[in-house]
Swiss-Prot record:
Signal peptide positions on this chain: none
Name recorded for this polypeptide: Probable cytosolic iron-sulfur protein assembly protein CIAO1 homolog
Matches recorded under PROSITE patterns: WD_REPEATS_1, WD_REPEATS_2, WD_REPEATS_REGION
Disulfide bonds listed in the record: none
GO CC, one annotated term: cytosolic [4Fe-4S] assembly targeting complex
PANTHER family the record matches: CYTOSOLIC IRON-SULFUR PROTEIN ASSEMBLY PROTEIN CIAO1-RELATED (PTHR19920:SF0), WD40 PROTEIN CIAO1 (PTHR19920)
Family annotation (HAMAP family): ciao1
Family note: Belongs to the WD repeat CIA1 family.
Any GO BP annotation: iron-sulfur cluster assembly
Chain's role: Essential component of the cytosolic iron-sulfur (Fe/S) protein assembly machinery. Required for the maturation of extramitochondrial Fe/S proteins.
Domain of life, per lineage: Eukaryota
Annotated WD repeat ranges: 15-54, 65-104, 109-148, 154-193, 199-238, 253-292, 301-337
High-level lineage: Eukaryota, Metazoa, Ecdysozoa, Nematoda, Chromadorea
Alphabetical keyword list: Repeat, WD repeat
């Protein structure tokens, strides 16, 4: 079901096995960014066509911006910018010019490791989260400079990830405190719209929306995947929307956490990666009123922990998945249905 078509070392050499934390596809599907413990961000090109041998070629290494491991990378929705978040407590924005990315902004203020940074759908806002338990909202002005819009501390522990709704300025965060939080702009400030405690037993490691933004999946330390659905859709005020858990699946025969979850925008397949070095696929079956999370199986492996999985967002390449691992590799997979 998932066929490995390539293995690539983040640092370029087989003997360099520094941990790879994350990969992120450009929205056009032909560019990939990766980051890891080597303090560098690398930009790759996807070479080839779906009916031929495809591979990744490293085109740029950005290694002058951070002094500690780079935990996350994300492209802006217009494709012009790339953002990285680091354990050095900084966030760096790179801008693409003549096909190359160069640093244009360094955002500082978090008190400790920044775990995630991601642009909103409109690219007007940038959200960051940190080990300091805070979620920051940055706003971009006409000169493409960023200023702090709001600082919230809704969690009681390390905030692991933030993710934007695919069509709205709605943000969700997940944390070491076993909870997820939703945020909206109330016209003056960003505010917490909903709190859901006890989502998992232990850390909630990762979150992902479906294409329409009506469903959300989470994975956690308890090796469980959980499905949430949006209620009150179509209400006069979007801030009346609430989310509730409707299904869960507990992965058996493992004691390891699930670290990452990604929802395929074309075929609705969900991928996870975890501490047992395995990649799993899931699908939501049954009716919307009675959904069931179906485990399609273990479909891929690494030598060490799988820290992140990411589907290609371009429909032409939507069957491509990348995985990032402690073993120092980025693996390229093809979904065969």
């Amino acid at each position: 079901m998932l066929r490995q078509i390539g293995e690539f070392y983040h640092q370029g050499e087989k003997d360099d096995t520094s941990r790879v934390w994350m990969t992120c596809w450009h929205h056009g599907g032909r560019i990939l960014a990766s980051c890891g413990d080597d303090k560098a961000v690398r930009v790759w090109s996807l070479v080839g066509e779906p009916d031929s041998k495809m591979r990744l070629e490293c085109r740029t290494t950005l290694d002058d911006s951070h002094t500690r491991a780079v935990r996350s990378v994300a492209f802006s929705n217009d494709g012009k910018c790339l953002v990285s978040a680091s354990f050095d407590a900084s966030v760096v924005v790179y801008q693409q010019e003549d096909g190359e990315f160069a640093e244009v902004n360094k955002l500082e203020g978090h008190e400790s490791e920044v775990k995630c940074a991601v642009f909103s759908k409109s690219d007007e806002f940038l959200a960051t989260c940190s080990r300091d338990k805070s979620v920051w909202f940055w706003q971009q002005d006409e000169d493409e400079d960023f200023s702090v819009s709001s600082i919230l501390q809704p969690h009681t522990q390390d905030v692991k990830q933030v993710a934007w709704h695919p069509t709205e300025d709605l943000l969700v965060s997940c944390s070491y405190d076993s909870s997820i939080r939703f945020y909206r702009f109330d016209g003056e400030d960003w505010v917490t719209q909903q709190k859901i405690d006890g989502c998992h037993v232990g850390t909630v490691w990762s979150i992902a929306f479906d294409t329409e933004g009506h469903r959300l999946v989470t994975v956690g330390e308890d090796h469980c995947i959980q499905l949430f659905v949006r209620e009150n859709i179509g209400s006069k005020s979007a801030d009346q929307d609430t989310w509730k858990s409707v299904a869960r699946y507990d992965v058996e025969n493992t004691r390891w956490p699930l670290y990452s979850v990604a929802w395929n925008s074309t075929n609705d397949v969900i991928a996870t990666g975890g501490g047992d070095c395995k990649i799993r696929l899931f699908k939501i079956s049954s009716t919307p009123e009675s959904p069931v999370i179906e485990h399609l199986g273990v479909v891929g492996r690494h030598e060490l922990d799988v820290n992140h999985v990411a589907w290609n967002p371009n429909p032409k390449f939507s069957n491509l998945l990348t995985s990032a691992s402690d073993d120092g590799t980025i693996r390229l997979w093809e979904l065969e249905i």
